[in-house]
Structures are given as structure tokens and as C-alpha cells.
């Protein structure tokens, strides 16, 4: 009995560390990009997946200790997909005591009507969903719309655009919506997917499957995700280094004439970013930029199940 109690304490200790890391990551992202301001009303988009559940939980947690006042309203879009468990999210949110709104729109029917059988439906579905969420944000008086994309999503998008789109373009932590009326934020921008997965497992969130519409996964994104996971296993710290690179862009040493005036370089011009010194042999740090070994990494692997609560 004492041994079981000791194991429980150990689990609680390590999971508290995990939650603190997620809180720290979210807090840093909020501060770096000025995501949340005094008096904000944040519309938290809740899909029923691990990412959005974690985002809501961490924002609720930060709300209690933040130096500013802000409110949260959770919003789920019920798209009338066959098999969607309508009771799950209302029951969960009622238990938490969180303000929420369930928006019912038969976008599934519209997509099935417009898109021929066998063709991908994700693009049209995404546009419809985005428009409904923007409208709902206006109706609720929300000043910010929070989405649950994390660090891995951002890196995947960068590589997708490089490999398939010919652009160095990622997924910004904060942006203006395409209708020019809403600010969209991604509070999990600095969070690792594997941390989110562990947290979701520990909290036993009532996960709703994401493939109820019957659509096929984005195979290109899946290839990129598998590649990054493989790199993360074989070369610890590479993911952190790549994400750090997204925050340390040097336009003068790329090739985009819209970002840097290469034609303006003439004799007597100022040396920019070290000039050709940048091509000298650099000392590569032994430890990848942005990466720190974690004492509890192996311990957390053992704690994916059999945990009741993280306080």
C-alpha cells in the first residue's frame, strides 16, 4: 500500500512538472506575441481533440494567476458529421463550469453536396468552418480567437510550404483573420506535441475522433510529420534548433529581393550582418540551440496511463 502511494506521489510530481512546462511555454508565447491583453474575451475553439482540450485547460490555469484580467468562452462547431457524440463536450464543459456555446451548422451536408465522391473535402470544409467561427466570434463579442496549433504543427507547415509550395512560410502564432476583423492567436505555439499528448492522456480528456467525416488524412503533412518525428528520435534537439531558426531569420543572407535590397549594394555600402564573414567556418555548439535535456523525460514515458488528476 505504501509502495502504491509512493508511486502515486511520483506520478503526481512528474505530471506537475509537465503541466508547469506547458504553462511556461504558453505564458512565454503569450508574452512574446502580446496574444492576450487586459479585458480580452478569448473565444477558445474546442474541437474535442487533445490540443484544444489542453489549450483550454492551460488558459484556465493561467487565468487564475495572470497579472491581467481576461475571460474565456469555449466554442465548438457541430458540423453534423455522422457519429458525432453531441453530448460529450456540453457535459465536459458543464462539469468545468466554463462558459460555452455549441454552434450547429450542417457543413458536412454542404460539403457532400458540393464535392464529388472521392475528392478531398478538407479545403471547402475549412473555409466554411472558418467563416462560421468568425461570425460566432462577432456574436459573442470575442476580441481574440484561440486555435490549438502547437510547435510541431508550425514546423510541419514550414516544411510543407518549402517542399511542395516553394515558399518559406509557416503558421504564425498571431495573425489578422482573412476578413480583417478578428485577431487569431495560437497559445500552444511553443508547446511540443508529445508534451500535449502526455498531458491529455494523464487528464483523460474525452477525446472525439477527428475522422468522423470519412476524409483521408493529408498525406503530404503525414510524410512531413513522420520525417520530423524520425529526426527527433535520431537527433535530439534538432526540432528545437529548427524552431529557433524560425525566430532568427537573416533576410540579407537569403534570396528574397522583397525582403532585402540586394540591388542597392554598391561600393561603399554598409556591411550587413557580417557580410561574407557569415560563410567562414562556424563553431557549431555541442548542444543544439534551444534544446535542454530533461530529467523527467524517461519517467514521463511511464506515466501515460494510470493517472487520475493533475492539480
Curated annotation (Swiss-Prot):
Gene Ontology terms: cellular component: cytoplasm
Subunit description: Homodimer.
Record pathway: tRNA modification
Motif (PP-loop motif): 47-52
Manner of cofactor binding, per the entry note: Binds 1 [4Fe-4S] cluster per subunit. The cluster is chelated by three Cys residues, the fourth Fe has a free coordination site that may bind a sulfur atom transferred from the persulfide of IscS.
Primary role: Catalyzes the ATP-dependent 2-thiolation of cytidine in position 32 of tRNA, to form 2-thiocytidine (s(2)C32). The sulfur atoms are provided by the cysteine/cysteine desulfurase (IscS) system.
The name this protein goes by in its record: tRNA-cytidine(32) 2-sulfurtransferase
EC number in record: 2.8.1.-
Residues reported to bind [4Fe-4S] cluster: 122, 125, 213
A GO term for molecular function: tRNA binding
Subcellular location: Cytoplasm
Obligatory cofactor(s): Mg(2+); [4Fe-4S] cluster
UniProt-listed GO biological process terms: tRNA thio-modification
Endpoints of the signal sequence: none
Family stated for the protein in its record: Belongs to the TtcA family.
Enzyme type, top EC level: transferase
Gene3D superfamilies from the UniProt entry: HUPs
Keywords, comma-separated and alphabetical: 4Fe-4S, ATP-binding, Cytoplasm, Iron, Iron-sulfur, Magnesium, Metal-binding, Nucleotide-binding, RNA-binding, Transferase, tRNA processing, tRNA-binding
One Pfam match: ATP_bind_3
The keyword Transmembrane helix belongs to this UniProt entry's keyword annotation: no
Substrates-to-products reaction catalysed: cytidine(32) in tRNA + S-sulfanyl-L-cysteinyl-[cysteine desulfurase] + AH2 + ATP = 2-thiocytidine(32) in tRNA + L-cysteinyl-[cysteine desulfurase] + A + AMP + diphosphate + H(+)
Keyword DNA-binding in record: no
Miscellaneous section: The thiolation reaction likely consists of two steps: a first activation step by ATP to form an adenylated intermediate of the target base of tRNA, and a second nucleophilic substitution step of the sulfur (S) atom supplied by the hydrosulfide attached to the Fe-S cluster.
InterPro entries (alphabetical): Rossmann-like_a/b/a_fold, TilS/TtcA_N, tRNA_Cyd_32_2_STrfase, tRNA_thiolation_TtcA_Ctu1
Amino acid at each position: 500500500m505504501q509502495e502504491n502511494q509512493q508511486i502515486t506521489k511520483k506520478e503526481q510530481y512528474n505530471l506537475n512538472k509537465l503541466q508547469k512546462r506547458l504553462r511556461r511555454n504558453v505564458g512565454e508565447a503569450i508574452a512574446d506575441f502580446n496574444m492576450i491583453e487586459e479585458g480580452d474575451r478569448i473565444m477558445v475553439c474546442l474541437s474535442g481533440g487533445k490540443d484544444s482540450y489542453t489549450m483550454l485547460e492551460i488558459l484556465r490555469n493561467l487565468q487564475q494567476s495572470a497579472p491581467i484580467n481576461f475571460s474565456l468562452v469555449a466554442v465548438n462547431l457541430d458540423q453534423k458529421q455522422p457519429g458525432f457524440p453531441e453530448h460529450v463536450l456540453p457535459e465536459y464543459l458543464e462539469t468545468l463550469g466554463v462558459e460555452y456555446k455549441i454552434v450547429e451548422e450542417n457543413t458536412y451536408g454542404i460539403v457532400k453536396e458540393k464535392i464529388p465522391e472521392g475528392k478531398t473535402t478538407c479545403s471547402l470544409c475549412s473555409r466554411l468552418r472558418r467563416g462560421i467561427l468568425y461570425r460566432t466570434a462577432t456574436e459573442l463579442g470575442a476580441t481574440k480567437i484561440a486555435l490549438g496549433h502547437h510547435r510541431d504543427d508550425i514546423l510541419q507547415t514550414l516544411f510543407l510550404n518549402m517542399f511542395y509550395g516553394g515558399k518559406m512560410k509557416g503558421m504564425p502564432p498571431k495573425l489578422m483573420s482573412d476578413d480583417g476583423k478578428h485577431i487569431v492567436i495560437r497559445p500552444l505555439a511553443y508547446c511540443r506535441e508529445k508534451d500535449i499528448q502526455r498531458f491529455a492522456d494523464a487528464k483523460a480528456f474525452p477525446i472525439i475522433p477527428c475522422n468522423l467525416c470519412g476524409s483521408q488524412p493529408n498525406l503530404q503533412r503525414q510524410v512531413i510529420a513522420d520525417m520530423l518525428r524520425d529526426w527527433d528520435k535520431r537527433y535530439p534537439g534538432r526540432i528545437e534548433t529548427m524552431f529557433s531558426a524560425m525566430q532568427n531569420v537573416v533576410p540579407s543572407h537569403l534570396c528574397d529581393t522583397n525582403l532585402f535590397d540586394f540591388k542597392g549594394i554598391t561600393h561603399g555600402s554598409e556591411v550587413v550582418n557580417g557580410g561574407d564573414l557569415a560563410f567562414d567556418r562556424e563553431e557549431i555548439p555541442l548542444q543544439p540551440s534551444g534544446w535542454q535535456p530533461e530529467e523527467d523525460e524517461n519517467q514521463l514515458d511511464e506515466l501515460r496511463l494510470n493517472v487520475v488528476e493533475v492539480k
